[in-house]
Amino acid sequence: MKNDVISPEFDENGRPLRRIRSFVRRQGRLTKGQEHALENYWPVMGVEFSEAPVDFATLFGREAPVTLEIGFGMGASLVAMAKARPEQNFLGIEVHSPGVGACLASANEEGVENLRVMCHDAVEVLHKMIPDNSLSMVQLFFPDPWHKARHNKRRIVQVPFAELVLSKLKLGGVFHMATDWEAYAEHMLEVMSSIDGYKNLSESNDYVPRPESRPVTKFEQRGHRLGHGVWDLMFERVK
């Protein structure tokens, strides 16, 4: 697995030329299990970054709806979703190698075969590798809220990013976000509502109840016990 994660800067057209990162690169130390998974399962489930668009039918060995998850953490919920929906294909992107290793180990243990993972900046992957009109779902769960005002520009959900996601979704595809930071939820809602081509799937035109398809993470469970809220947003591509 190549170790060349970068996060380029957006230019005025939303292209990835930036040096402002939406993540802090915390590689951490690999456990023996994570290192074993990277060495043994990456050749099967890992996808190296490429300048060329990916062919999903070739990548997965079949034609099936593709869900892309950005920032899957340790991969527990992503593996659970892939296992629960074997008729679909899942591609996960995570910039921290311990999380990638943990996800690979879990997928192997659970016998999940419809999952592929990448260790690279998601913005560049979207621009370079994901074909337009190819995704059935894009998932972004609990991204860094960058809660200090001077850091708000680092939030991944900005108009250029949301427009980029829109271009990669099929007509009828859905962009599903979740955050436990209310101010970020409001920011997400403002950004998404400003873009022509998305339809808010909330009946109240704001947030949706957590769908059963999104597993509750340990982090989220701990937040519930502390009285923290969680906000889910789902927007469909309609044009």
Swiss-Prot record:
Residues 150-155 are annotated as: Interaction with RNA. GO terms for molecular function: tRNA (guanine(46)-N7)-methyltransferase activity. It comes from the Bacteria. S-adenosyl-L-methionine binds at E69, E94, D121, D144. InterPro entries: SAM-dependent_MTases_sf, tRNA_(Gua-N-7)_MeTrfase_Trmb, tRNA_methyltr_TrmB_bact. Its EC number is 2.1.1.33. One of its GO terms (cellular component) is tRNA methyltransferase complex. It catalyses: guanosine(46) in tRNA + S-adenosyl-L-methionine = N(7)-methylguanosine(46) in tRNA + S-adenosyl-L-homocysteine. PROSITE patterns: SAM_MT_TRMB. Substrate binds at K148, D180, T217, K218, F219, E220. SUPFAM superfamilies: S-adenosyl-L-methionine-dependent methyltransferases. Pathway: tRNA modification; N(7)-methylguanine-tRNA biosynthesis. The active site is at D144. GO terms for biological process: RNA (guanine-N7)-methylation; tRNA methylation. Pfam families: Methyltransf_4 (PF02390). Keywords: Methyltransferase, S-adenosyl-L-methionine, Transferase, tRNA processing. Belongs to the class I-like SAM-binding methyltransferase superfamily. TrmB family. Monomer. Catalyzes the formation of N(7)-methylguanine at position 46 (m7G46) in tRNA. This is tRNA (guanine-N(7)-)-methyltransferase.
